[in-house]
Amino acid sequence: MPHTLPETELHNPQSTKPPLDPHLKALENEAIHIFREVAAEFERPVMLYSIGKDSSVLLHLARKAFYPGRIPFPLLHVDTGWKFREMIAFRDEMVAKYDLDLVAHTNPRGAAENVTPFTHGSALYTDIMKTEALRQALDAGQYDAAFGGARRDEEASRAKERIYSFRTPDHRWDPRNQRPELWNVYNGMIRKGESVRAFPLSNWTEVDIWRYIQAEDIPIVPLYFAKKRPVVERDGMLILAEDPRLELLPGEVKREEVIRFRTLGCFPLTGAIRSEADTLDDIIAELETATVSERQGRAIDRDQAGSMEKKKREGYF
């Protein structure tokens, strides 16, 4: 059944915007159904909020799912201290604008030991500041379900993960031990200490995300749009060179290029792409002819063969 809303900023009958096409409407309905199912089945759900485009769509869908009430669970942001400055500013703007309950967590051990992408390398840094930090935050909040914005088209290990992804008491995932999911029937039974990661965007593609952002006029971090920015080329990636903590290596030169980001994370580990796409129409047109995954710009996915699956088995997003 379609999910409609009274006249609000989320749904305005007087709007001149065309209605969602049937494909996007079906994806929206599925996602809203998943949000409501998890909220009804679990005692302490939480939504992982990484501030990127998928999180922005996830937040919009959550607001739709529970209108006219507030979102009935907090948002959790694992703050490594190395996100793009524009991401943190955007996060704070969204929290204030929509009166969100945000929990931000930084791994105290990592902060005390000054763990950084530069000093510890991407693999160890990600394990301590992201995976370990996420497990800490989930334990501290005693959350039994966590919404995430992962999509199956992103990466091989995510392609085989169910919408309800079951985790052991220490948050580990076993891809060989997944439950069947028949149509829209989800089995949320868990033992004490276990939890579920739920992925309402599982069946969306990157282009679906952008078309929905355009159709619903969803705010996103400006870094997704092309403009001239300072960059340095390192390990085959274009790294944004705005943060004073980025020290140039011998032979490196900072220069201005017209770039944008297809994916956002910690700035030292996230590569930009050369692009002139500075509007939503341009971004969608660019992606329709893209031949590589958006995660090609993530250094953490290059650590070793199967690195993402290894991280997910250990409790990563």
Swiss-Prot record:
**Region of interest (Disordered), residue spans:** 1-21, 295-317
Question: What pathway does this protein act in?
Answer: Sulfur metabolism; hydrogen sulfide biosynthesis; sulfite from sulfate: step 1/3
Q: State the top-level EC class.
A: transferase
State the species of origin: Rhizobium meliloti (strain 1021) (Ensifer meliloti)
Flavoprotein listed as a keyword: no
The UniProt function text for this chain reads:
With CysN forms the ATP sulfurylase (ATPS) that catalyzes the adenylation of sulfate producing adenosine 5'-phosphosulfate (APS) and diphosphate, the first enzymatic step in sulfur assimilation pathway. APS synthesis involves the formation of a high-energy phosphoric-sulfuric acid anhydride bond driven by GTP hydrolysis by CysN coupled to ATP hydrolysis by CysD.
Q: What is this protein called?
A: Sulfate adenylyltransferase subunit 2
Q: Which reaction does it catalyse?
A: sulfate + ATP + H(+) = adenosine 5'-phosphosulfate + diphosphate
Could you state one GO biological process linked to this protein?
Answer: hydrogen sulfide biosynthetic process
Per UniProt, the ranges with Basic and acidic residues bias are 1-10
Q: Which gene encodes it?
A: cysD
